[in-house]
Amino acid sequence: MPTLNDELKTFILSKGASLVGFADLHEIDTEARDGFPFGITIAIALNPQVMSKIKDGPTAAYYEEYKILNEILDNLGSATAQWLIDKGYKAKARPATFSEDKANLSAKLPHKTVATRAGLGWIGKCALLVTKRFGSAIRLTTVLTDAPLVAGKPVNESLCGHCTHCVDACPAHAHTGTIWQAGMPRQALYDAFKCREKARELSKKSFGETVSLCGLCIVACPWTKKYLEKAANKIR
């Protein structure tokens, strides 16, 4: 007989998700998780054809992809929360993109933090989630719930090793090159303000929009390159 995990994962994947993970959030500050004990990470892979065109900075196609996936994720998060509510549980979907702490350009509970607790990947030197299947070429959202889910095994250490591809690719020189470990503050990995400033400069130059979007560290990652190459080989 299918478990709650099985039923929920099947539902989310059927709606277009690329990855789904379940996280135990008990060790995270209660306020940050709005009192919910579990989190669901939903990920959708970025279009490999769009990402492969990023060479010197963000493109208009990447910006459109970013907006489309954010809308899809918001709808998917809401649908997931409603599915749980219909089952008699409490649930709350969080927006795909938001910043609660304007002083640090951060959220009180980042999607990528929940994703590492769910076992989907680790945080790279670019301060983004890295997955074995898609690299960093994904967008994320989170649903918080009190449903008694069986959580995945948390990832607490980086697999980046000596690799510095994302650090070297950053035109803002925003990354420190520090290897991530669970609980490490984001500031130890990169300067969000340097990243934002350069991204806005590049997007304005590329397609006339001042947005905090770049993509160079994403496509520089060897794990992302594996995903893009695999996708390209399928097309050939």
Residue map of PLM features:
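Non-catalytic, usually N-terminal nucleic-acid engagement modules in DNA/RNA processing proteins
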Residues: 1-69, 73
